[in-house]
Every structure is written in structure tokens, then in C-alpha cells.
Amino acid sequence: MSSYFVNSFCGRYPNGPDYQLHNYGDHSSVSEQFRDSASMHSGRYGYGYNGMDLSVGRSGSGHFGSGERARSYAAGASAAPAEPRYSQPATSTHSPPPDPLPCSAVAPSPGSDSHHGGKNSLGNSSGASANAGSTHISSREGVGTASGAEEDAPASSEQASAQSEPSPAPPAQPQIYPWMRKLHISHDNIGGPEGKRARTAYTRYQTLELEKEFHFNRYLTRRRRIEIAHALCLSERQIKIWFQNRRMKWKKDNKLKSMSMAAAGGAFRP
């Protein structure tokens, strides 16, 4: 309220000391909202306000620095109780006021400048405190995020190591039936390249399939040999050798049969 009163007075009457104040000399004529100037701390205005004396010294820049404000605060605080309340006696307060100047022609008073400066400083201080609070909160959040990242780092590293380690996949083995297994393991390199080759033992299923094929055809083509080798899980060489041995056996059986038949026919000849 006090700052509003001073600023409005300075805007209407720029020449404060030259104008005789009216209706302010008698304490009874003052309303309740204007308190005693002696009870108000003059240092709060920051520019040497003493009572109602509005004679102030303008600085070159129009604003007051922190050093001038501090000095004026000390001077105002020491001189406030010693000086009288008003510079003019109460008998001269009824003189007619001069014509007010337009507000556009009035230069900004240092009181208003200091008042706005105080508002700006308060706004800046509140903004700085808000920025500091947000910075503190963001820093705490950053610390929390960093700690969370540090906690997640071991878990992620463990997952990465678990993923990087190849899981032991079972080796893909072909399905082997009992008739596909060999009864005797052949050792080709035991006796060297010129050593005796181990005999191959065929299963019943393999022997049966080979006998059926030999019954239909005693000689195999290359294509049919490959098909039988894949079907019986044997090599082409094994199929070829088996068919050779089977033909030799067949010839021997036929020769013995023909010889027996010839011998039997000669015996029954009359």
C-alpha cells in the first residue's frame, strides 16, 4: 500500500519538494489506510525516503545498483527517527495545488524504477529458485536413473552373456533301425593298405532285400545300384560285391544241379 501511494504521488506531481502538501499535516485528517510515516521503515524504499520528502537524486542510468541501495538503506534507517515527519508546517497545507502535468510528459521517477526493479528482482529470484529446484529434481532423477541403469547393467550383461553362449544343440543323427547296424566293425587301416579287409556282415532285412532284387534281376544298373544303396544304408561297392558273390554262388548251384541231373539221367538209361 505504501509503495502504491508513493508511486501514484510521484506520477502526478513530479516536483515533490516544490509543492506544498495539503490535508496531510493534521494527523486527524489522515485516513486509517495511511499509517504514521515514523512507524514505517524508511529503508524499505531503497532510495533514502524520509517522511514525505520526495527529493531524490536520479542516477545516470535510471536504476540503482546494489551498492547504492545498501548505502541509502543505511542512511534512511539512521535518519528516519531524527527528522520531522513533514518538511512544511501544517498551516501551509491549504494552498491550492498546481495544474497536474500529463502522465506522458512526466519522466519515470526513481521510486517507480526501484519498485519495478524490486519486482523484477523478486521475479528473477523466484525464477532462479524454481530453476534451482528443477535442476535439483532433475539431478535427483538423473541420479536415480543412473542408479537404475547401474542395477540394470548386471542383468543386461548376464542376459547378453547367456545369449552369446551357444546352447548345446543335440546333434542331428539319422534314425538308425536295428537292421541298419553292422554286427562287426570293419577296421580298414589296421593292416595297412595291403592288409586283409574285414568281412561285412549284413542284417536279415538287408539280405532279404538283396535276395529279392537278385531274383528279379541278376545284374544291376548304376542307377538301380544307387537306389538300393540308399535304401539299405550300404555303399555301392558293397552292393556290387554282394551281387558278384551271389552270381558266383548261383552258377555253382546250377552247375552242380545240371551235373546231378545228367548223372541221374545216365543211370536210368535202358
From Swiss-Prot:
Q: Which InterPro entries match?
A: Antp_homeobox, HD, HD_metazoa, Homeobox_antennapedia, Homeobox_Antennapedia_CS, Homeobox_CS, Homeodomain-like_sf
Residue numbers of the DNA-binding region are: 195-254
The places in or outside the cell where this protein is found are: Nucleus
One GO cellular component term of this record is:
nucleus
**Membrane-crossing residue ranges in chain numbering:** none
**SUPFAM superfamilies xrefs:** Homeodomain-like (SSF46689)
Please classify the protein's predominant subcellular localization into one broad category.
nucleus
The protein's GO terms of the molecular function aspect are: DNA-binding transcription factor activity, RNA polymerase II-specific; RNA polymerase II cis-regulatory region sequence-specific DNA binding
What are the UniProt keywords, alphabetically? Developmental protein, DNA-binding, Homeobox, Nucleus, Transcription, Transcription regulation
Q: Specify the superkingdom.
A: Eukaryota
Q: Which purpose does this protein serve, as stated in its record?
A: Sequence-specific transcription factor which is part of a developmental regulatory system that provides cells with specific positional identities on the anterior-posterior axis. Also binds to its own promoter. Binds specifically to the motif 5'-CYYNATTA[TG]Y-3'.
* Family as reported in the entry's similarity comment: Belongs to the Antp homeobox family.
Subunit annotation: Forms a DNA-binding heterodimer with transcription factor PBX1.
Q: Can you say what this protein is called?
A: Homeobox protein Hox-A5
Q: Which organism is it from?
A: Bos taurus
Query: What lineage is this protein's organism placed in?
Result: Eukaryota, Metazoa, Chordata, Craniata, Vertebrata
